[in-house]
Amino acid sequence: MENTEKLKNSKEIVAYLVEKFPACFIAEGEAKPLKIGIFQDLAERLADDARVSKTMLRSALRQYTSSWRYLHGLKAGQARVDLDGNPGELLTEEHIEHAKQALKESKERVFASRRTNNKEEKAKQPRRPAPRKADAAAKSDKPKAAPKAVVADAPLVKVDAANLKVDQGVRVVLGKSPVPATIKEVTKDDVQVQLQTGMMLQVKFEHLVL
């Protein structure tokens, strides 16, 4: 008996589209530019498919086409493809420039969020009070002590995947410093989170900390 259980989130739907239309949707690497109006084609092809709703399909398609790897694939000379992988019209210069700008803005939002998080972490660190003049003069006569060994920061607390919930606040390790985020979807293999900038990311459990 065919499985008719509804797909629960965008990741599952994208994986389903990759399986059902492998000549059009790519799971890894640079994605192929999609034909304009491909949502309507998908809606017609999947009209009798009880596993996919139009609302979830639209959300999954939006996530797929706004991903960095999809935007990277929009280059001069590339042709848009339909669901069967047949090439159509070539990308216009306007669409290529729009993709470059969208990719640039998306990366800038992530990096800006990292910088903001770094500043917030530094601001939370307690400051030592300035020494009084008399104390400073007395200390200036003493020999300088050998530099102390650098004390490592306390280790980050990894999340327990079994206890993660939608709308829970976590931090995403994107570089040297974790970035605040809110959980939007929890799947078997990873989590969809929303950064403070509004950007949505799909990350593995090991990249989340409290």
Swiss-Prot record:
Keywords: Chaperone, Cytoplasm, RNA-binding. One of its GO terms (molecular function) is RNA strand annealing activity. The keyword GTP-binding does not apply. HAMAP family: ProQ. The keyword RNA-binding applies. Its main location: cytoplasm. It holds the Pfam family ProQ_C. One of its GO terms (cellular component) is cytosol. RNA chaperone with significant RNA binding, RNA strand exchange and RNA duplexing activities. It comes from the Bacteria. This is RNA chaperone ProQ. Residues 103-124, 132-144 have a biased composition (Basic and acidic residues). Belongs to the ProQ family. Residues 103-148 are annotated as: Disordered. GO terms for biological process: post-transcriptional regulation of gene expression. It is found in: Cytoplasm. It comes from Aeromonas salmonicida (strain A449). InterPro entries: ProQ, ProQ/FinO, ProQ/FinO_sf, ProQ_C.
